[in-house]
């Protein structure tokens, strides 16, 4: 059969990345408590395409992913990227796994357990120069405004904020490490299940630890700098302001050797 993809294109331009998005598959992830956990991932795969080819071979991405079927790790994703490069005769290969990660968390007063989900992403790129991996973890926290607390006779405004961490690692680290860092950096962690005594505890704890979005991002950055396995990070905290018609955000990006 005719291979139309191999024809010359009308406009001979290199394409930086072409491929497939939102392939869904079961995924096995390492779990600090249980060893592993089963989740579901949405996967993007891509390669570069030289100017002399009209199109890439989309089916080969699916074939590579079907053959892969592995526990996610830097090593296993590297094998997938190598296979994609070979199958598509590409210089660069790209893969991105997006998945929810679940932790059973006990409510702070009653101890009632419930699963909390955290959105995670692992992105890998491979070319002749080497491999590059970025781990991303999104963690919701609660913040209480220090200014509102200081100037109000009763109460202060509070809201949920999202801590988004992008990390380049020296070696494997548990997802729980970074979830713990984020949850310790706001006014309070958030929970799926809270009884009345838990709501009382969370409210009082949060109001005893008011934090600006600037405080949260600095807290996270300091803890990431001290982690030991992180060589680069970008952390952004976005506060879904409860009394404003806008959100607030703060961001820090650092190589660990850069302390300023």
Swiss-Prot record:
Pathway: Cofactor biosynthesis; 7,8-dihydroneopterin triphosphate biosynthesis; 7,8-dihydroneopterin triphosphate from GTP: step 1/1
Keywords of this entry: Hydrolase
Enzyme class, broadest EC rank: hydrolase
Reactions the enzyme catalyzes: GTP + H2O = 7,8-dihydroneopterin 3'-triphosphate + formate + H(+)
GO biological process: tetrahydrofolate biosynthetic process
E.C. number(s) listed in UniProt: 3.5.4.16
Entries under Pfam families matching the protein: GCHY-1 (PF02649)
Superkingdom to which the source organism belongs: Bacteria
InterPro entries per UniProt: GTP_cyclohydrolase_FolE2 (IPR022838), GTP_cyclohydrolase_FolE2/MptA (IPR003801)
Site feature: May be catalytically important: 145
Single GO term (MF): GTP cyclohydrolase I activity
Role: Converts GTP to 7,8-dihydroneopterin triphosphate.
Family: Belongs to the GTP cyclohydrolase IV family.
Protein name: GTP cyclohydrolase FolE2
Organism: Desulfovibrio desulfuricans (strain ATCC 27774 / DSM 6949 / MB)
